[in-house]
């Protein structure tokens, strides 16, 4: 697991560049030390991968177009692919450290169009109303997922069968998230997560909301 203190973007975009992300095993594990980021925050960005995270210590705030959620130590969650988000370190008493699994859904689903993708993956990642699936201690079902999530970060890449064990752990977690998200999937969503130009305009609005924004300025942010 790599310690990270900054974020990289694709040129001319706010899509996150993921160093070390390979097609033959589309997954990376990160330990984000938020206090070492410039300004103690990760700016607005998105990625085409799933973000599954667990708060090792401290607390962070996630911002998405749908609102803000505070995640203290011991909590966690899932950020859907293509969802615009930013994070801020909140705790001033302890280190704000976040553990992350970043992976392409093909790691779990296999070939595109597979039965697994159609039944268990697509219903979640194509639901525009699902930006975040938050997990907090105190809720029995969510606590079960959090325990599995915390344990999954203890797998060592040096041990025999690591890739298979990791995929097995992530698959079990995903299936539980699928069940947990049932009520969320039943709600109707309106916005399009995959439109990059809309994302760029939303970032501009979030960063300049105190100013008077003109239509030409907003258009220039995306074109």
Q: Which residues are covered by each model-predicted region?
A:
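Short, Lys/Arg-enriched, Trp-marked, Pro/Gly-tolerant hinge/linker segments that flank
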Residues: 131-142, 155-217, 221
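Detector for the N-terminal beta1/A-loop initiation region of ABC nucleotide-binding domains
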Residues: 61, 86, 208
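Ligand-binding loop in jelly-roll beta-barrel domains
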Residues: 82-108, 113-116
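Generic protein-terminus/edge-of-domain signal
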Residues: 1-76, 82-83, 118, 129
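Short histidine-centered beta-strand/loop micro-motifs
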Residues: 40-46, 88-90, 110-113, 162-164
């Amino acid at each position: 697991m790599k310690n990270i203190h900054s974020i990289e973007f694709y040129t001319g975009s706010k899509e996150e560049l993921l160093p070390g992300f390979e097609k033959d095993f589309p997954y990376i594990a990160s330990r984000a030390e938020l206090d070492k980021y410039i300004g103690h925050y990760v700016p607005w960005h998105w990625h085409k991968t799933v973000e599954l995270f667990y708060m090792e210590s401290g607390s962070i705030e996630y911002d998405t177009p749908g609102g803000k959620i505070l995640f203290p130590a011991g909590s966690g969650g899932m950020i859907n692919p293509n969802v615009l988000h930013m994070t801020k370190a909140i705790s001033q008493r302890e280190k704000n450290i976040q553990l992350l699994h970043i992976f392409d859904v093909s790691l779990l689903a296999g070939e595109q169009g597979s039965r697994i993708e159609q039944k268990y993956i697509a219903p979640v990642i194509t639901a525009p109303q699902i930006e975040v699936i938050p997990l907090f201690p105190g809720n029995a079902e969510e606590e079960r997922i959090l325990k599995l999530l915390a344990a999954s970060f203890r797998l060592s890449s040096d041990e025999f069968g690591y890739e298979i064990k990791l995929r097995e752990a992530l698959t079990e977690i995903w299936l539980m998230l699928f069940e947990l998200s049932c009520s969320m999937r039943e709600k109707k969503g309106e916005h399009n997560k995959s439109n990059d130009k809309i994302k760029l305009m939303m970032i501009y609005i979030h960063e300049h909301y105190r100013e008077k924004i003109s239509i030409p300025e907003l258009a220039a942010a995306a074109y």
